[in-house]
Amino acid sequence: MLHTMQLLLLATIVGMVRSSPYTSYQNQRFAMEPQDQTAVVGARVTLPCRVINKQGTLQWTKDDFGLGTSRDLSGFERYAMVGSDEEGDYSLDIYPVMLDDDARYQCQVSPGPEGQPAIRSTFAGLTVLVPPEAPKITQGDVIYATEDRKVEIECVSVGGKPAAEITWIDGLGNVLTDNIEYTVIPLPDQRRFTAKSVLRLTPKKEHHNTNFSCQAQNTADRTYRSAKIRVEVKYAPKVKVNVMGSLPGGAGGSVGGAGGGSVHMSTGSRIVEHSQVRLECRADANPSDVRYRWFINDEPIIGGQKTEMVIRNVTRKFHDAIVKCEVQNSVGKSEDSETLDISYAPSFRQRPQSMEADVGSVVSLTCEVDSNPQPEIVWIQHPSDRVVGTSTNLTFSVSNETAGRYYCKANVPGYAEISADAYVYLKGSPAIGSQRTQYGLVGDTARIECFASSVPRARHVSWTFNGQEISSESGHDYSILVDAVPGGVKSTLIIRDSQAYHYGKYNCTVVNDYGNDVAEIQLQAKKSVSLLMTIVGGISVVAFLLVLTILVVVYIKCKKRTKLPPADVISEHQITKNGGVSCKLEPGDRTSNYSDLKVDISGGYVPYGDYSTHYSPPPQYLTTCSTKSNGSSTIMQNNHQNQLQLQQQQQQSHHQHHTQTTTLPMTFLTNSSGGSLTGSIIGSREIRQDNGLPSLQSTTASVVSSSPNGSCSNQSTTAATTTTTHVVVPSSMALSVDPRYSAIYGNPYLRSSNSSLLPPPTAV
């Protein structure tokens, strides 16, 4: 305790001595010492140093090398001690900072004149940062690569302090972190560094024509500098197969090149059977020089070197077929495939089969249907029409109620329903169901049929007659045919050249594994029809058919004659108006032109009894006119030296002169010496007289005389033995022709103007 008090007293005395103003000197000390700093090249750095009670000389050292004691630090232009002596501030200012300034600095004060001890500050490290140079990619601006073959891209950034940080970014803006190798190499000055980053890239099609960039930066400058390179990637074709729909139809099921128009079919849609299908193969490749090949179920298609393939008639055999398109270029080959989904109508792959079963046994009927989409199958029992199943297989226990006929019906939307039937037969003894009385014709071949339902199938069928079994040894008169029918058997006994003694009662016996059945069948003779009656009947039928044929032919010919002729041909017409005058135009040659007979109607109004008719028949047409009067007839006929022209009748009313002009045909009746009448037609021409009435000038045509016995002879109008009588046919007897028979009626280019027709030649 005493020792402690002594120590405290000693310390107090020492403190009082140091703080006393009467002390002979005071120690110098640092009020502020320099600290470690970091600066970028070109920046300004100040290392602080303040000294209290400075007695000695102050200087800065750089890596233990003294810089000088004066404030301007001569010899070091970028260095200076800033501050004031009064404040004891001797801070070191460096501007601009250079890489050489990267060192350890210390502020030192030498001992004072009165023996004050020297003092030194702590070392302060100045770290100088240098931004890196712009990065460079050693491969240049473009690198050529092949898909899936690795390449290396190197990015170098030089002169950074610290070494530059390098970041890789792909063409999509994604930062790459994998498959990168980063190394730092010091420069010879051992202060700066070269940073190198190698990107090991596996090129893909997506990288084609994209830019990869590397970014370099360090703590001296956080603004990155970058370099980029464009990647040209050669890649194998990228293939896509599309199924295109087309119009229904197409024949032959052939596979060929490009087809017609089509519609893109979405995935999952079905192709209708028998339609035309076009498949398109799209390929993206670099280089683009490619070769196409098509396959169906790995079988190459001949001529399939195009971008499209057409199946002209797609059938159900193409359902689920794999259509593959293979495309190849210099880099490699690739492929794509599409599975065809064909919609087709249902068809039976396996029809239900009839079965034989015992009561209580279990049977299974199978109905396999091929269709797309899958069919709806329904089993129906007949005759109840009750649905008993809806699956491919129908299994049930056999009984009297379940035995019978079953229908399998398959339905697919958009297609016709199909059905098939099968029988389930109960096994038992046979039962004969034939007619008990059958007939034959004496002298002809007779047949007796014995039908028996037999499940299982009959193993023996026999015939007996008058107690004796009929067999192959019974003579050549008999033969037996046995045919299997659904659910039974049919036996036919054939009797050749049957006679009366062959007719009678026959027994048919059917035997199977479950029993037998016997039926007695009566064979009766039916009366034959006599040969004479057969012949008479046949002749009657033939005669009736012959008469009927003749009547039909006559009816058809008569019906054809009643048909109207064409509009420009007048084959026959009659004119009967107040005098019984009739005319008939007969062609001398069937190839003649009927249109030479023309009817011209001038104006739109024809008064009653006034006819405007113009005939100009060719020579080969003969016009025969007959006029009945007092039991005699006059026949007028022109030959090809004369023309019969019935000119247009014109009626003009003039209010001042009250004149009327009428052109009428003239008829000359000639009495021959033989008592017959001959006539001539005189073509008339209008000659106006002073009194306003027209006179007629005529040309005489040749006349054909008609003798009482009906013969005709050509007569000359100049014969001395004839007497000519002039008879003017009144206008009421003028010929009337339906204007629709005119060629002008149907052809406006043949219609003439209102000018008058040329007059006929004047008679001499």
From Swiss-Prot:
Disulfide bonding pattern of the chain: C49-C107, C155-C214, C281-C325, C367-C408, C450-C508
Domain (Ig-like C2-type) ranges: 21-120, 132-230, 237-343, 346-419, 430-530
Bias (Polar residues) ranges: 692-701
The UniProt record lists the keyword Ribonucleoprotein: no
ATP-binding among keywords: no
GO cellular component, one term: plasma membrane
Tissues where this protein is expressed: Postembryonic expression is strong in the developing optic lobe and in the eye imaginal disk.
Entry-linked Pfam families: C2-set_2 (PF08205), I-set (PF07679), Ig_3 (PF13927)
InterPro entries: CD80_C2-set, Cell_adhesion_signaling, Ig-like_dom, Ig-like_dom_sf, Ig-like_fold, Ig_I-set, Ig_sub, Ig_sub2
Signal sequence segment: 1-19
UniProt feature, compositional bias: Low complexity: 702-719
A GO term, aspect molecular function: PDZ domain binding
Stretches that traverse the bilayer: 534-556
Domain of life: Eukaryota
GO terms for biological process, alphabetical: cell-cell adhesion; cell-cell adhesion via plasma-membrane adhesion molecules; chaeta morphogenesis; compound eye development; compound eye morphogenesis; compound eye photoreceptor cell differentiation; compound eye retinal cell programmed cell death; homophilic cell adhesion via plasma membrane adhesion molecules
Record's keyword terms, sorted: Cell adhesion, Disulfide bond, Glycoprotein, Immunoglobulin domain, Membrane, Repeat, Signal, Transmembrane, Transmembrane helix
UniProt-annotated glycosylation sites, renumbered to this chain: N211, N313, N393, N400, N507
Membrane-topology annotation of the record: Single-pass type I membrane protein
Extracellular side of membrane: 20-533
Primary location group: membrane
Cytoplasmic side: 557-764
Location within or outside the cell: Membrane
Region span, Disordered: 640-660, 691-719
Function comment: Required for correct axonal pathway formation in the optic lobe and for programmed cell death in the developing retina.
Protein name: Irregular chiasm C-roughest protein
Organism the protein comes from: Drosophila melanogaster
